[in-house]
């Protein structure tokens, strides 16, 4: 006898439903993911309980989920032959938010039995996602092991009340019928549903089936009879999770094809790493390094991150919580048995478990790159050409792994003689001169400007290698990478160029003598240039150039000033230090100049030339041109 009752949802369910529908789920199609996931839960739950009570199968052990659509009626139906629900279970689990029965089921498990149960979904918000697209939802269910007349029908429009009615249901399990809103009728389409199943549920271990219509008998192209076929239910998902298989059972081709499936990339990946971790946290990761950078790698709004699965059920794309920004090029997935999620299952809880997973996966990627660099330099060079600039963000972002990241960096160098960034810091250290204590580098606007900078003259003469940095991010990188393996990184354009043990006592004595002899010249330059410079000094870093400008210790470099100006940031006023090469013929000639006006003009000329050489531009180029023209006029007059 049918027995119908009307119940009110528990406290504030109406408001919670409204919040979830309009705020928590921005992607409407995930209603199917949630309902298929719940259906697979029910099948997995039955499979586990049937291990100790085979009669629960009722003679039907082929577990499956079936999805169908009726365009005329505007409905979508999701049906499973899983554990089903009793009347009390329906009222409890479909009358509350954040509770689906699965969480209660987990509480009844203990010890190793929990490991063996392939169960997911620890809360009940998922079912209510049906109301994102449905104006009315009907649920028909019967619990396994109960009689046919103990079936239950649940119905609601999601407005605060639901009805529960006793019905007769021959088959165990649950059938959910969604009566779609007029504006959501697009989902009452087989092809639309198939694409969603393939996207979200491809790797659920339970087959997710849709009905494939039969075909009548027909004539073939050569007049032969093609027999009729019967309609049948056919699995839309692969029902296998590649990453759950042993690495030895997966071929390279399968790994490559799976990469293309999850990344939508047409090219093979450069490398991958497949790992299963057991212990306090149990998870499997499958991480890929692409061969090519995506076109929008530098788009600030570009989504990145790993695909997140819980027990092989797809939860979300772009789970960026598991990978730092400087590794945003990494593709792949993480599949966790016990990862905590918040109420919506869309946003990961930022807790200790999540942070530990992030740290472990970051180290895994760095290990991949270290191995690639060690085993296949050409392949690593290919990686660097695509993603090196992104990796340079690492030292600023990830202090804990700064040394490892630094070991992966590649630079152009005076040693190689070309612009290809192929030199590692370890390569540099291995070639350091006896007594050399620092790693020397220069940052410039271009490789040519760096390679031809006058600041390199003495170092080139002594055969000391200098790293040539010319990308916009390099100054930012160096500001967060002060040393490597106890070797300080030192800019050849900053402060005094102290070569330490690389200069003998005779050289140092000669330098001191030259500085003393040039003091009157230095004072004349200071007087002529006034507040245009912070200081004037004699230098030995120059051999072929009359003068250069350098940045004082602790001051902002010219490259950093450019970066901040480009970003619209305020920049503190700074004045360069002018360094003079007194052995250069032009400086020696100026030392003898008696006309202080002419001396001042030449001093300004040398300062402008040195500034242009180091910074690539002048604050007032028109004034410089005026000065040049004025001096040219005098020379031809």
Swiss-Prot record:
InterPro entries per the UniProt record, alphabetical: HATPase_C_sf, Heat_shock_protein_90_CS, HSP90_C, Hsp90_fam, Hsp90_N, Ribosomal_Su5_D2-typ_SF
Chain residue ranges for the region called B: 346-562
The keyword ATP-binding appears for this protein: yes
Pfam family, one: HSP90
Recorded GO MF terms: ATP binding; ATP hydrolysis activity; ATP-dependent protein folding chaperone; unfolded protein binding
Coiled-coil positions: none
Location of the protein in the cell: Cytoplasm
Keyword vocabulary terms for this entry: ATP-binding, Chaperone, Cytoplasm, Nucleotide-binding, Stress response
Region annotation (A) ranges: 1-345
GO cellular component terms attached to this protein's record: cytoplasm
Keyword Signal: no
Source species, domain of life: Bacteria
Primary subcellular site in the record, as a coarse category: cytoplasm
Region (C): 563-637
Family: Belongs to the heat shock protein 90 family.
Subunit structure comment from the entry: Homodimer.
Alphabetized NCBIfam families for the sequence: PRK05218.1 (NF003555)
HAMAP family to which the protein is assigned, alphabetical: HSP90
Free-text function comment from the UniProt entry: Molecular chaperone. Has ATPase activity.
PANTHER family: HEAT SHOCK PROTEIN 90 FAMILY MEMBER (PTHR11528)
Name of this chain's protein: Chaperone protein HtpG
Organism, scientific name: Shewanella amazonensis (strain ATCC BAA-1098 / SB2B)
Gene: htpG
